[in-house]
Amino acid sequence: MDPAAAGIVKEEMLESQQQQRQEDGGAAPRPMEGLHEVGPPPFLTKTYDLVEDPATDGVVSWSRAGNSFVVWDPHVFADLLLPRLFKHNNFSSFVRQLNTYGFRKVDPDRWEFANEGFLRGQRHLLKTIKRRKPPSNAPPSQQQSLTSCLEVGEFGFEEEIDRLKRDKNILITEVVKLRQEQQATKDHVKAMEDRLRAAEQKQVQMMGFLARAMRNPEFFQQLAQQKEKRKELEDAISKKRRRPIDNVPFYDPGETSQTEQLDSPYLFDSGVLNELSEPGIPELENLAVNIQDLGKGKVDEERQNQTNGQAELGDDFWAELLVEDFTGKEEQSELDGKIDGIDELAQQLGYLSSTSPK
């Protein structure tokens, strides 16, 4: 083949190809629409599918307006649903992820989150949700701290305050209870100290009493005599038989009661009194009245001794015994003085009866 002819054929083929290209210029192959576009993150798509699933409406679902979703049961959501989609069961981590994509908490009393691109029935808007990036000039540790503070401030701050208030009220109640118990314990300790101090004082008094008793050999003898005297007085009063006084001319019946006449230990024979009560002898009447009064005083003293004898030997008796320093001898001298007074009255009575005119 002639080389010149071959060159001509080649040029014609090139021209035809070039002309065909010019004719098919508008129908050249192009890439698919949206082929190089970036889709929504897997976290958003999984969360959207989870909220859209009607089988999980008891745990998580859309709100009535459809512009937010509500986690009704965080515990079941974290235990069952999160491990199935996100391979973890940390609800706080899920909330942190929502925070990084710009979700906000709508209701402080429940876990309700909203975003302008997260709407019911509009899945295509998920691509408008962008992940927030921290400033590039800040260190990673500071970025993490800012994220944590933002999460606590927006999503957990109210619940944390409520929990702290409850803990504070519980602690205040416990402190008040402990203070009451402390005051009761102080009062009990003070009462025990008072009782211990009183017991120590009694012990000191008892030791002093025993020391004085050992230094005084007559003490036990005097104590035994005193007890014997009391016993004799009790026996004498219980066995004494009184005779009623008959007509006494120098006593007014209105002045002396029958009980006083029966209580008198000095009872006189009516015949003797009639002999002594002659006209013109007023001294006999006065002496008889004095003797009667003296007898009443003696009965009162015996009754008082009986009462004291029946009482127990308490602290007052020992204190009186220690202070008076065994005054048994003085009581004996007083008793002798009373007997001497009675003898003197009897002598005067005999003198007057002997000198009275016949």
Swiss-Prot record:
This is Heat stress transcription factor A-2c. Residues 164-214 are annotated as: Hydrophobic repeat HR-A/B. A motif (Nuclear export signal) lies at residues 345-352. SMART domains: HSF (SM00415). It comes from Oryza sativa subsp. japonica (Rice). One of its GO terms (biological process) is regulation of transcription by RNA polymerase II. Gene3D superfamilies: Winged helix-like DNA-binding domain superfamily/Winged helix DNA-binding domain (1.10.10.10). Expressed in roots, leaves and immature seeds. It comes from the Eukaryota. InterPro entries: HSF_DNA-bd, WH-like_DNA-bd_sf, WH_DNA-bd_sf. Residues 1-39 are annotated as: Disordered. GO terms for cellular component: cytoplasm; nucleus. The hydrophobic-rich region (HR-A/B) corresponds to the oligomerization domain. AHA motifs are transcriptional activator elements. SUPFAM superfamilies: Winged helix' DNA-binding domain. Belongs to the HSF family. Class A subfamily. A motif (AHA1) lies at residues 265-274. Its main location: cytoplasm. Exhibits temperature-dependent phosphorylation. Homotrimer. The keyword DNA-binding applies. Transcriptional activator that specifically binds DNA of heat shock promoter elements (HSE). Keywords: Activator, Coiled coil, Cytoplasm, DNA-binding, Nucleus, Phosphoprotein, Stress response, Transcription, Transcription regulation. A motif (AHA2) lies at residues 315-324.
